[in-house]
Amino acid sequence: GAVSHSQVAVDILKENKIDLQNSRITVVGVNKLNEDILKFLSSKNARNVVVVNRHEEKALAFAAPYGYEVKSLRQSNEWMQNTDVLISATSAPHAIFTKEDFHEKKHILVIDIAFPRDVEEDVAALPWVTLHNIEDIEAYAKQNIRLRYDEVGKAEVIIQEELQKFMKWQSYSLMRD
């Protein structure tokens, strides 16, 4: 299972059975987390991706290798209406999306990887919004780490058993010589 925030975001897309070829995916913020997400989307031939940033010039350079569209954060009324999936990871010191930004139209999946949060907590109460915030993503990653540790314990037991068999075989082999 995924342990990095960008990997968890990708897992959430998979779990929600997002049609990457046809869904309108908006990625907000220019940073390493979102770069990893753009690489994944590009590798899955996601065509309908928009990169949004406060500074359009930065977004243009960021989106260029993938050929994705770019919008300004100030134009959120324009691009939010058509968004099926919103992935946000900015360095803003406060929330940049409120309930008023999520128009009642159709379902939207929101993945907020920012700390502090980019999306106000009360957005989760909107019935047409499915919100995964940084706390959800941290819990998911920690659960996957626990599962990995459990598997390590099982592997260690198997290694010890096989090592015992080998040592027994080796001592038997040496006694025959």
Predicted regions and their residues:
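Adenosine-phosphate binding glycine-rich loop
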Residues: 15, 103-109, 113-177
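Helix N-cap at the beta1-alpha1 junction of Rossmann-like dinucleotide-binding domains, i.e.
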Residues: 56-57, 115
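Short acidic low-complexity segments
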Residues: 67-82
